[in-house]
Amino acid sequence: MLRLDQVSLTFNEGTMDEKNALQDVNIELESGEFLTVIGSNGAGKSTLMNVISGSAIPDTGNVFIDNKAVTPMQEYKRSQMIGRVFQDPMAGTAPSMTIEENLALAWARNKKRTLKPGVSKKRKNLFQEHLETLNLGLEDRLSAKVGLLSGGERQALSLLMATFTEPSILMLDEHTAALDPSRAELITNITDEIVKKFQLTTLMVTHNMQQALDLGTRLIMMDKGQIILDVAGEEKQNLTIEKLLNEFQRIRGEQMANDKAVLG
């Protein structure tokens, strides 16, 4: 599970560039819950992800993962509990290494180091079984350099690596935004399958409102560092893009930008 209690973070405090990135944010995710997060640029979505991952430390408030306070925990230690996929397909893999070597690194996370060299046949078979679920033919290309894969293939591999050890929290940071529409749809479908299969507690940030509506069990909308809308269950299922935009206007008394970056 994941919990944020009264989390606030201000950048450039006391200067002309002061910005309240997060303001008294409270979130509680139960085990297996899938939360999608939307909002325009500067709403606080990325800062929220960084505070959870540990790459940004809040000024006030606390972050809990599996009922353990992790706010003072260094990012590299916190990463043992978190799987994260970034927007850039190049960010989650080592391009100069093979598919097999990348998977071996992901597999070794949270496990005791041994002196055994290479990858055992049993583990190689396991890697192939996991790759088969992607339906991209990567199970037959274990020796291929990851740098030679397409963006969609690399992002699918990143997603697989992030979920290999079934992390306490899976964070998806606009992980389909850099892909063409067909590959974005593929990665979206793979995401849905993996999250449901392993019942992963998931937080997904997206600019694509339709994606936020189609995926997940709960949705929050952020604006100016605050959560201004939080819906789940039947209420979320009945939402449309038009209703979301109208709700933003009702809450904020202003019109949300109606551009491609927001509507996807």
Regions found by a protein language model. Give the residues of each.
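H-loop/switch region of ABC-family ATPase nucleotide-binding domains
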Residues: T206-H207
